[in-house]
Amino acid sequence: MNHKFIALLLVVLCCALSVHQVSAEIPSHCTLPLATGTCRGYFPRFGYNVEMGKCVEFIYGGCDGNANNFRNLEECQQSCSV
């Protein structure tokens, strides 16, 4: 019984460390949510989608966004590449 608990604990620790390592490699501004903002503009932009692990296009309204907002795919990939 004690060996099973230790094995389970090791698995959990390994998973936690691997998640921490991946998130540490991605710049913090790239982990922000894709924010359309509160204005009604229509500006195609790119942002890093953490769940997909890549830059994706989204529509930015023109104000109140965040730093995960790039004018083109290349800028996003250069800033958020792992």
From Swiss-Prot:
Q: Tell me the first and last residues of the signal peptide.
A: 1-24
Q: Which domain of life is it from?
A: Eukaryota
Q: Does the keyword Secreted apply?
A: yes
Expressed in which tissues? Expressed by the venom gland.
Keywords in UniProt for this one? Disulfide bond, Hemostasis impairing toxin, Protease inhibitor, Secreted, Serine protease inhibitor, Signal, Toxin
Which Pfam family, any one, appears in the UniProt record? Answer: Kunitz_BPTI
Give the disulfide map: 30-80, 39-63, 55-76
- Residues of the BPTI/Kunitz inhibitor domain: 30-80
- Where exactly is the site Reactive bond for trypsin? 40-41
List the GO cellular component terms: extracellular region; extracellular space
On whether Signal is a keyword of this UniProt record, the answer is yes
Q: Name one GO molecular function term.
A: toxin activity
Subcellular location per UniProt equals: Secreted
In its UniProt record, which GO terms are filed under biological process? negative regulation of fibrinolysis; venom-mediated suppression of fibrinolysis in another organism
What does the record's miscellaneous section state? Negative results: does not inhibit chymotrypsin, factor Xa, thrombin, and tissue plasminogen activator (t-PA).
Function of the molecule: Serine protease inhibitor that inhibits plasmin (Ki=2.01 nM) and trypsin. Acts as an antifibrinolytic agent.
In terms of PANTHER family, this protein maps to: KUNITZ-TYPE PROTEASE INHIBITOR-RELATED, TISSUE FACTOR PATHWAY INHIBITOR
Q: Which family does it belong to?
A: Belongs to the venom Kunitz-type family.
User: Can you name this protein?
Assistant: Kunitz-type serine protease inhibitor Bt-KTI
Q: Which organism is it from?
A: Bombus terrestris (Buff-tailed bumblebee)
